[in-house]
Amino acid sequence: MLRVAVPNKGSLSEAASAMLSEAGYRQRRDTRELVMVDPDNDIEFFFLRPRDIAVYVGQGTLDVGITGRDLLLDAKVEAEELLPLGFAPSTFRFAGPVGDFSGVEQLEGKRLATSYDGLLRDYLAERGVNAKVVRLDGAVESSVRLGVADAIADVVETGNTLKAAGMEIFGDPILKSEAVLIRRSGSGGAANGTAKEIEILIRRLQGVLVARQYVLMDYDIRKDLVEDAAALTPGLESPTVSPLRDSEWVAVRSMVPKKETNRIMDELYDLGARAILVSSIHACRI
């Protein structure tokens, strides 16, 4: 049975469970449940603190897990990223009092508060910056006001919390993060016979990603305009073209990027396409 770690709370939790549900896996109904078995798919889910997931997977206690890229790298364990999952985007940045800092070189000899000390120490060492790292478990933005630190390094989603604390972002991003699927480094699941189950999980999650990013577009168009229309809707490999009762016309079906749907529909209509319909993709395998 495949053993999978899932975030039990925070910004990763709901989105991770929703994605697994879309991929066809049973998920818990009560947030107090810590373990959930899906017998139909021979899989067991363990709901854990996002920060601990990389540790469990890196030690081989669990086969795979969903966590943040920032948490994976900060944990410094033998676990590797298998698949970016496209949700919970964030950026790990430096921030300090407005006007005090403009670049990382100004952090020499300063005190830096963070919840990601492993990640931060590596970044500073790579750039030859000698600063004192103060590890905090949360509310990092308060450390400057309380005199614990001169600046901070923290995960930023909107930046509103920093502004409210009288701070601004400076320097280049330390890391761009999102939710990722991870496994123990180099394991492949071969040791405990879960390689096939991991492959199926990855394929299903990839299908969800594609289904979220694309829609299915159908339209009718004259035969002599098919090549121009296909240039607008090339699909992943090639559009499907089917004959209609009127031999001068054909029906075309293609996957198109969801965010470009209306622009493509407008251009197809101007080209001469009619009966343009768009359908959502519930699931797919590419």
UniProtKB/Swiss-Prot annotation:
It catalyses: 1-(5-phospho-beta-D-ribosyl)-ATP + diphosphate = 5-phospho-alpha-D-ribose 1-diphosphate + ATP. Keywords: Amino-acid biosynthesis, ATP-binding, Cytoplasm, Glycosyltransferase, Histidine biosynthesis, Magnesium, Metal-binding, Nucleotide-binding, Transferase. Its EC number is 2.4.2.17. Pathway: Amino-acid biosynthesis; L-histidine biosynthesis; L-histidine from 5-phospho-alpha-D-ribose 1-diphosphate: step 1/9. NCBIfam families: hisG (TIGR00070), HisG_C-term (TIGR03455). Belongs to the ATP phosphoribosyltransferase family. Long subfamily. This is ATP phosphoribosyltransferase. The lineage of its organism: Bacteria, Bacillati, Actinomycetota, Actinomycetes, Micrococcales. The gene is hisG.
